[in-house]
Amino acid sequence: MPSILEDPTTKIPPPESLLLSLKSSSLNTPLKTTTKTGANVTLYPITNGPLSLPQPLLRFLHNEFSAEIEMGCTYPMEQPMKFEAFGEYWFGMFGVVAVLDREGDGECELSVDSERDWEKECLGTFYVKPNYPGRCSHVCNAGFLTTNAARNQGVGMVMGKAYLHYAPLLGYKYSVFNLVFENNVASVKIWERLGFSIIGRVPGAARLANSETPVDALIIGKDLTGEDVVDKD
């Protein structure tokens, strides 16, 4: 979800702790996990901006995000971003890409030369950035996208757990999601299972394509200090 008061064409300056954390070897280490369907997945942290990604992958993710916006059900934007703007918006600070493992695959990073069938092998992505500027920049926000081919496989939960791994390593102390639309039941369930709480509500905040009446936006938060990831299910 977009950071509070954020114009997608601008960027809230990162906290100093984030700039230091981006050099950490633990932050740059991919995570390996398994979805509920038994698929092996690697989550690759992206710390060097959109140009460090394979451009076919970036274009695929741009197309997926554009389709999500045009669907009009989960993000507040009404028009898709241009390709260059998307790359900076999503990967300009810190992002993660979830990729299906291939048998015998020893690849430990996504280089600009990586060649994959991204439509089949890229499962999703998320970004992490400050939710507020300056003295409040230790509070973070994130945006998530599960690719169309990977839906209903538990990828959202995998990325949610990865978010709770990386966000504290980036120096963030608290997480806020500003606009989780109440009718996005799957998203709400994921965050509740991971120990998040509903800390606010904006009545009738969204005019969504999947509702004839305005939908409430939930503000969902979690303290990131000294807590392990707990799946409550």
What kind of region is each of these model predictions?
Residues T125, I199-R201:
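Residue-level detector of high-confidence beta-strand sites
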